[in-house]
Regions:
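Short coil turns that delineate tetratricopeptide repeat
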Residues: 31, 65, 110, 144, ...
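Alpha-helical segment of the N-proximal tetratricopeptide repeat
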Residues: 32-59, 63, 121, 125
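Canonical positions in the second alpha-helix
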Residues: 59-60, 104-105, 138-139, 172-173, ...
Length: 332
């Protein structure tokens, strides 16, 4: 009887071990297959074949739901195939899945800036302003002293027509280092894009002042930065005159704006004699003078033509120099 029970127990243990090993083998095989799909998906991801990558990542997760490394890449693939403005059900599904997998990835790595940035981007694309803002503000908290984080937020607010918040971000960036001329350049660009000419002019002038006050900058570099700053100021002055109809801007004001632009562009040519672009806008400013003083049209047209010729001469010289340098590099 004891022998019979021993045989039964042995058979039970043997069958249990067979089942256990079979289960382990099956799990091991599934994981190996999952890794194969994951590896292929990564290749498709690198090659920017995102739809193919999606299929492979999803297959990998079916075989191994614990393959958590796939969450971020799968979410990023869905971000890449999502088309803003497309209200089809399929596209909405892409957006939903992008958010789902990126949130799963964030649960694994709560402080991963790339994941948070991607969540901000997909919510921005899906016009989920509050969610996008939440994630972008999280990114900014990681790098409170990085100017780029303020520029990114300002761009986000501007694109969503939250102009007061955009200005706030530009001003916060300037507050990081008020002596740094770069912050005023970005704020001036924002005002110019929104046709706020006077505010743009003001910030370009502050930029010029900050560059001029920089005692640590080498003279050659300072001259180049100042030439660029005066050029940009001149361009805004031309824009203000060109974009403002004659019945809105009086002749006296127009001449003042044109003169400010003329002085700035002339300064740019003095600081950078081989810089062709200021001459093109000097020509355009003379055309604007004819609006304020139509009786002097012939005189101003003649001056404008001189500026065009100077621009063409310098432009031709610049292109020839660039071509020479390219040819020289090929010979090395």
């Amino acid at each position: 009887m004891k022998k019979l029970w021993s045989v039964i127990i042995l058979l039970f243990l043997t069958s249990f071990l067979v089942i256990s090993f079979s289960g382990c083998d099956q799990l091991k095989i599934s994981n190996l297959k999952a890794n194969k799909h994951f590896k292929l998906a990564n290749k498709y991801f690198t090659d920017e074949k995102f739809k193919k990558a999606i299929g492979e990542y999803e297959e990998a997760l079916k075989l191994n739901p614990d393959l958590k490394a796939a969450f971020y890449y799968l979410g990023s693939c869905y971000v890449s195939v999502y088309k803003p403005g497309d209200d089809s059900e399929k596209n909405k599904e892409f957006g939903t899945k992008a958010t789902l997998y990126l949130q799963k990835a964030l649960e694994q790595s709560p402080d991963n800036k790339d994941i948070i940035q991607s969540l901000g981007d997909i919510n921005d694309k899906m016009r989920n302003f509050d969610q996008a803002e939440k994630y972008y503000l999280q990114i900014q908290k990681f790098t409170p002293n990085d100017p780029a984080s303020y520029y990114n937020l300002a761009g986000f607010y501007s694109n969503n027509r939250k102009y007061d918040k955009a200005i706030e971000m530009y001003e916060k960036r300037i507050a990081l280092d008020p002596a740094d001329a770069e912050g005023y350049l970005y704020l001036a660009g924002f005002y110019q894009d929104n046709r706020k000419w006077d505010e743009a002019i003001k910030n370009h002038e502050i930029r010029i002042q900050k560059i001029d006050e920089n005692a640590t900058m080498e003279e050659k570099a300072k001259a180049e930065f100042l030439a660029d700053a005066y050029y940009r100021l001149g361009v805004v002055c031309w824009n203000k005159s060109y974009q403002t109809p004659a019945d809105v801007m009086a002749s006296v004001e127009r001449l003042q704006v044109v003169q400010k632009g003329h002085d700035a562009l002339t300064k740019a040519t003095e600081l950078s004699p081989n810089f062709p672009d200021p001459w093109a806008y000097l020509s355009l400013l003379f055309r604007q003078k004819t609006i304020a003083e139509p009786l002097k049209k012939a005189q101003y047209d003649k001056e404008a033509e001189k500026m065009v010729q100077k621009f063409q001469e310098l432009r031709k010289r610049k292109l020839a120099t660039e071509q020479f340098m390219k040819d020289l590099s090929k010979e090395k």
